[in-house]
């Protein structure tokens, strides 16, 4: 399982009292955090032209820290009058992802109404068809209310069908569910990426809001072995928090490697 990080995690990191420039993010992640992949949130790309996206891709490739998922932060509605705009948005995201070299786009649904479910699914499928020429996958992140119901999301993905539609479950949504194990069992079979949502760590080193290792174990128990993206949305000590999450998750993913590192330090 490959540990990666989201650009949202770095939004409050300062270098010489300034935020990290978008083009410098891959080098920072690879050299300072020791992570080898990025989920780029769409807010990072504001004001960037196509040539800038290609430069970011080149920097990421040179740093061996590729962009794996382009994550849109605005919930999209594929029902009623909003559907056409949402489909255009997905097409724009697909084009941006192709410039970044990202194989997947992740979106959050703003609604998932029980009525006219088939029509809603058909519109999402049309949006997916609009990015097929970019060879881009479309991943659905859990949203609020019915759009966060794992059973409904799984039904939507099955209804759309094909290998280019998938899910992107998050630890935060799983922890908030009535049954986190059921949440993961329903969505992870369709997952092409998983978001390891992170909050603050206590003085003891324990994660305050949910058990990161227990959620990781639940994900692995359903056979998931793809990327796990650390996502920290807080302002306080972002680098230290990311590093704590990285070390905790890395040790759980490969205990033998962690033991070897500890043995070398003891020598």
Report residues per predicted region.
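Boundary/entry segment of secreted carbohydrate-active catalytic domains
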Residues: 1-22
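Hydrophobic faces of well-ordered beta-strands that scaffold small-molecule active sites
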Residues: 1-8, 36-40, 67-72, 105-107, ...
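Acidic-and-aromatic substrate-binding clefts and catalytic sites of carbohydrate-active enzymes
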Residues: 15-18, 40-54, 75-85, 111-118, ...
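Short, acidic/polar
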Residues: 15-32, 82-95, 176-186, 212
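Catalytic domains of carbohydrate-active enzymes, especially glycoside hydrolases
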Residues: 21-43, 100-101
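Acidic/histidine-rich catalytic cores of soluble enzymes
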Residues: 31, 37-38, 126-217
């Amino acid at each position: 399982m490959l540990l990666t990080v989201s650009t949202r995690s770095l939004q409050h990191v300062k270098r010489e009292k300034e935020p990290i420039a978008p083009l410098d993010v891959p080098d920072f992640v690879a050299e300072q955090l020791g992570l080898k992949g990025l989920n780029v949130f769409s807010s990072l790309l504001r004001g960037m032209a196509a040539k800038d996206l290609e430069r970011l891709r080149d920097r990421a490739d040179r740093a061996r820290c590729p962009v794996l998922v382009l994550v849109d932060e605005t919930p999209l509605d594929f029902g009623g009058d909003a559907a056409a705009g949402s489909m255009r948005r997905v097409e724009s995201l697909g084009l941006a992802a192709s410039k970044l070299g990202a194989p997947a786009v992740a979106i959050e649904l703003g609604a998932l109404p029980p009525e006219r479910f088939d029509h809603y699914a058909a519109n999402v499928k049309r949006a997916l068809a609009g990015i097929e020429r970019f060879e881009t996958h479309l991943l659905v992140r859990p949203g609020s209310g019915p759009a966060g119901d794992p059973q409904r999301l799984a039904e939507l993905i099955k209804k759309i069908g094909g290998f280019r539609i998938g899910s992107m479950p998050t630890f935060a949504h799983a922890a908030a569910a009535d049954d986190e194990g059921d949440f993961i069992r329903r969505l992870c079979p369709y997952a092409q990426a998983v978001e390891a949502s992170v909050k603050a760590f206590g003085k003891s080193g324990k994660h305050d809001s949910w058990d990161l290792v227990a959620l990781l174990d639940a994900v692995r128990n359903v056979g998931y072995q793809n990327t796990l993206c650390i996502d920290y949305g807080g302002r306080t000590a972002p680098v230290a928090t990311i590093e704590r999450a990285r070390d905790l998750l890395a040790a759980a993913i490969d205990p033998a490697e962690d033991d070897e590192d500890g043995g070398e330090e003891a020598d």
